[in-house]
Amino acid sequence: MGSEDHGAQNPSCKIMTFRPTMEEFKDFNKYVAYIESQGAHRAGLAKIIPPKEWKPRQTYDDIDDVVIPAPIQQVVTGQSGLFTQYNIQKKAMTVGEYRRLANSEKYCTPRHQDFDDLERKYWKNLTFVSPIYGADISGSLYDDDVAQWNIGSLRTILDMVERECGTIIEGVNTPYLYFGMWKTTFAWHTEDMDLYSINYLHFGEPKSWYAIPPEHGKRLERLAIGFFPGSSQGCDAFLRHKMTLISPIILKKYGIPFSRITQEAGEFMITFPYGYHAGFNHGFNCAESTNFATLRWIDYGKVATQCTCRKDMVKISMDVFVRILQPERYELWKQGKDLTVLDHTRPTALTSPELSSWSASRASLKAKLLRRSHRKRSQPKKPKPEDPKFPGEGTAGAALLEEAGGSVKEEAGPEVDPEEEEEEPQPLPHGREAEGAEEDGRGKLRPTKAKSERKKKSFGLLPPQLPPPPAHFPSEEALWLPSPLEPPVLGPGPAAMEESPLPAPLNVVPPEVPSEELEAKPRPIIPMLYVVPRPGKAAFNQEHVSCQQAFEHFAQKGPTWKEPVSPMELTGPEDGAASSGAGRMETKARAGEGQAPSTFSKLKMEIKKSRRHPLGRPPTRSPLSVVKQEASSDEEASPFSGEEDVSDPDALRPLLSLQWKNRAASFQAERKFNAAAARTEPYCAICTLFYPYCQALQTEKEAPIASLGKGCPATLPSKSRQKTRPLIPEMCFTSGGENTEPLPANSYIGDDGTSPLIACGKCCLQVHASCYGIRPELVNEGWTCSRCAAHAWTAECCLCNLRGGALQMTTDRRWIHVICAIAVPEARFLNVIERHPVDISAIPEQRWKLKCVYCRKRMKKVSGACIQCSYEHCSTSFHVTCAHAAGVLMEPDDWPYVVSITCLKHKSGGHAVQLLRAVSLGQVVITKNRNGLYYRCRVIGAASQTCYEVNFDDGSYSDNLYPESITSRDCVQLGPPSEGELVELRWTDGNLYKAKFISSVTSHIYQVEFEDGSQLTVKRGDIFTLEEELPKRVRSRLSLSTGAPQEPAFSGEEAKAAKRPRVGTPLATEDSGRSQDYVAFVESLLQVQGRPGAPF
């Protein structure tokens, strides 16, 4: 098949290149099975060079006016081959404007001798001149008559997600476009659900790829966790964020096999399951990609890791694949007993008896539906809303497709053939992006829906999947029926080249574009139009609705109320349209000359492909910078007054107060303190840096037998010789000072990630062997720490004002706390494995002069070296041990930073919601009026609603479910279920679904009245009581005048358009009037204490 046989399935795991003939090129699935039979999948990446006579598009001269709705500026931070990439969304631009920008002097490709020279310049200049990437644009550049390798219509088993579940995942089973320029990057990642991906470079400059064989993917993950501990602790699958860049030099240094390859225009790249890949663009170009699957992928999908820190990551329910294609393992899999062992060397099979049976049943079902539609076309009748659409048949588990909750009103009309309906879709409503007409097949042209009107899963509006709707029926010749794998005819073939993977998707939200403008384009790029299968949930917008409308959210029954979308979820000026249009029910129908409901309306659930959201902002200062300290703004209370009761000889807090340097040195006091610390989580005097004693004491008070959950036992006796998991990442010891390159990992940590706790026989200090740099097998009963071995009974740390704890010697023969050496950026362990000596000569004079906010009044003179809060340009300074005693939050950070420090001032700001005081009716508060200024006002109404968050089996979730919707438990009487409990609930379509309970949240909304009589409905987080300290942003906009806005921020029409219409249940839809119970409910909510408009 245009390739040489590379022997026993490519044992060297090199990237292979294939050149199929036109005949071989016709069957996509068959050719993928063939290249795997040659071992291409072992590299994680393969290149396919299509036949010269094949062209996906006749010309690219007509796309300059196409809009790139949300370009992403890629800001990269880091050094020494380890980088983090952040995204900043820019304004929309056309392809023509983007081309001119990419070719401008600032962004153009630098002069270079060859690709190797260009690669060196890429890694050398990665952090300079942030490029702009036009990524994740839903649509295709293929001509509609291209059948071979059409990225919009590959017809692989991934189509089961759409055909059986009715789920559309943009960029996963639909195509995405990517416009790149020099240095635009896709970071290390595997595909969502560890799927395959295909990438075609339509035109422009080449694209360089790096790939790691799937059998070595775990090694890359372990390396990334070591250098980015902050990210890994926040999310186990943090590489799915597509923010982590690791250079080939680092990969070579740590012995991780990888290959590289360059993709030229007109070439395909295919990535394989669990194949980590990364890369960059050489200049202006355009690529198109999507995901697909084979039979081999199913086992990968069952064990794929999921991002745990974001709700909108793609998750495909594997139920349909296992039930249909692995029926013999289905029951075991449902019970969690199907132990899958992945064999990365095994090639995929082209077909199976189960797949053939499913394909045949789809063809049979389609034929029956076509016959029925012809009969119905000759006898049109008006359908009843309550009648079922039709019974679905077939082995895939057919079900009745009903009207979704009766929430879409449709006019009567003749019924049509579903195929006609697919070919001649209904025109789009006014205001929606309409770029052309798209035929069935996803990659071909059909009417489009503005992305701003699509519902993102992160908004919480995706309901569970409907019973499988037999909705999407391809033509007879398009129905995929795989043929047996025939012996290939080998030609002069695949050269094992060096590189390759596929661009990482980014966050794109297209703006609304007038339909007239786009209709003038010969071949516009077209996003997809799909139908959401259930009523959308209305979001409350405090500034766009009246008080009466706001409280309707609580009065009406049904799980449809939702908290306002946070500003962080909205990524551009077009998001107002996103709020108003998201989650609506749409029906696509056409009947003869008029618009009418079709019995075979196509219902789809839509999900977005995982994109790289701005999970954080780039750091505002370098790791070694010192912020100039301000005079009085940093005042903090001392963590311990020094007057604590010391009657309890084993109490930790009073013992700590005895360790100040201004007290007389007492070795016995240090012994007592170390012994008490050894019985307190995390039981290691060094790990406590990231788990302070105040946190451990609070945990013991609330739950005496609670453990840290990191392998630490929960009992209180001595932990010496027990193995637990250290909390200090190895990178904290290897970075700092002049260390600009990562160093080898510590060999004193076991393969299971644990290390034994060891205790000093003299001072009772307890540490992990790995944290203190001691070879475990050398520890005996009489082991002593470095300080006791040197008989330095009066030793104290030169960087802080507290005694006790784990000490090591410095290069100038002084002593230093290990935790101080870790947290002070310029300190450096010369022998990383043994954790000593410590070089502190690089600490700048400015750091020695910083004053600790906790001990500067206690100590007569400034001593030691302080660290500072990591929040932007905060100048709050403290000694490491003072901050640790005060409970300042310190966490592992990502390279090249070591420790992330959050002072109490910024920590409380981040958790302000938990500290909000209760607000009562009649209370005078301060809140923002429509004109953007803050005024005093009186609370005249209050309402609260408890909502549950649940996860459904198909990967969708709801975070605004009413307790009454759960049928398996009386939540009103018994309260919420326990976390993780499986519950049964009734959804808005009237059907019962099973889901997993996640959490319960109670939301509060208040109606306030300003001095001029105007009223507003606000959330609790937007209210400030007179007793609270007002944030600076509020104080600067606080007005003592009347709260009347100078001019309305929104006209009546704008406010009406901004509020999403609530889609009620069938009963609510039929009765448009207000019941007496509802009126009484609202009146009770709006009871006013005091006369409205009375002076405050």
Curated annotation (Swiss-Prot):
Start and end residues of each JmjN domain: 15-57
Biased composition (Low complexity): 391-406
Presence of keyword Transcription regulation: yes
Disease: Intellectual developmental disorder, autosomal dominant 65: An autosomal dominant form of intellectual disability, a disorder characterized by significantly below average general intellectual functioning associated with impairments in adaptive behavior and manifested during the developmental period. MRD65 is characterized by delayed motor and speech acquisition, variably impaired intellectual development, behavioral abnormalities, and dysmorphic facial features. Additional variable features include feeding difficulties, hypotonia, and seizures.
Top EC category: oxidoreductase
Protein's name in the database: Lysine-specific demethylase 4B
Upper taxonomic lineage: Eukaryota, Metazoa, Chordata, Craniata, Vertebrata
One protein family per Pfam: JmjC
